[in-house]
């Protein structure tokens, strides 16, 4: 059963029925443990910082009730919802990005599958109606092979947040083909091609909801949001990093996304908000994964402490603390 939707202020599409579609239903947690809803925000390569947070969930023995993700957060969220542990995600990421030449060859072998020549591929991507890289092919080259084909094959309910280009509204996907939904959530115009799905043209969900902690609608006791979208900052040495052309194209929209997050937090905040100190990394710094992991360790410990406090509070409300 699909959820009904309504629009508020012409800005976002929201669920109006109590509960979620059948494909995202999950039993309440047992005993005195609260249920957790985890929102993973967008931020390009900074999204690698989501992995230590997911490791923390495993270390605490917390199985999320539901996960939502935007852009890179959708990619990470789907992988975790498929049953891949945080530790295995770290290993996969390290293996993938430690071999720069191999990953580039792997990527372009997928891209060339749409045409028998690289020249043909470039010709297509320069066409105004087919901008740049096809996201589904990119994901097929980079994602772990364990991912199921559909949302229904996931072990944890998952919501992919996208933007309907023509309606200019949020569109949340919770069922059907998985890879196209993730590709749509991460389809940054000018970099990845928009995705046609459900009769809609979908682009990066960050344009309407870069930190989707408000899509759960009371589905869990504790809502945690991981914000990996800090704006450009000075490097570790205190000097400004002058962005490349691509970094300027990809990173400039982050200014608007951060504004959206700030305005959301003024009226509605998650129970737990974690912001790893990763502002000195650029959105395309995927090959700096080890440095991002290291920079995220403090946020991981902060998240664990926040979860433990939330569990204690929940037990006290039950009279068991």
Please state what every model-predicted region is.
Residues 1-70, 78-321:
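Patatin-like phospholipase
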């Amino acid at each position: 059963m699909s959820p009904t939707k309504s629009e508020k202020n012409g800005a976002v599409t929201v669920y109006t029925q109590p509960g979620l579609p059948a494909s995202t239903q999950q039993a309440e947690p047992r005993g005195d443990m609260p249920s957790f809803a985890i929102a993973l925000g967008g931020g390009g390569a900074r999204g690698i910082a989501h992995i230590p947070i997911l490791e923390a969930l495993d270390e605490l023995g917390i199985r999320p009730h539901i996960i939502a993700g935007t852009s890179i957060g959708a990619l990470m969220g789907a992988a975790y919802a498929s049953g891949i542990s945080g530790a295995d995600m770290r290993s996969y990421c390290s293996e993938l990005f430690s071999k720069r030449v191999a990953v580039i060859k792997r990527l372009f072998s997928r891209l060339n599958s749409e045409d028998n020549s690289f020249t043909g591929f470039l010709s297509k991507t320069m066409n105004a109606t087919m901008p740049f890289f096809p996201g589904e092919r990119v994901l097929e080259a980079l994602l772990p092979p364990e991912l199921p084909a559909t949302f229904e094959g996931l072990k944890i309910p998952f919501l992919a947040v996208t933007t309907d280009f023509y309606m200019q509204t949020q569109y949340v996907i919770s069922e059907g083909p998985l890879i196209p939904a993730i590709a749509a959530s991460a389809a940054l115009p000018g970099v990845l091609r928009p995705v046609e799905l459900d009769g809609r043209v979908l682009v990066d969900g960050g344009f309407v909801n870069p930190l989707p902690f408000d899509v759960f609608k009371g589905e869990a006791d504790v809502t945690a949001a991981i914000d990996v979208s800090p704006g450009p900052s000075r490097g570790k040495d205190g000097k400004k990093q002058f962005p490349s052309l691509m970094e300027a194209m990809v990173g400039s929209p982050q200014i608007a996304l951060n504004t959206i997050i700030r305005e959301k937090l003024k009226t509605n905040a998650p129970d737990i908000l974690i912001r790893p100190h990763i502002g000195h990394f650029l959105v395309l710094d995927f090959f700096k994964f080890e440095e991002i992991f290291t920079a995220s360790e403090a946020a991981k410990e902060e998240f664990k402490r926040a979860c433990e406090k939330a569990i204690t509070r929940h037990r006290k409300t039950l009279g068991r603390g």
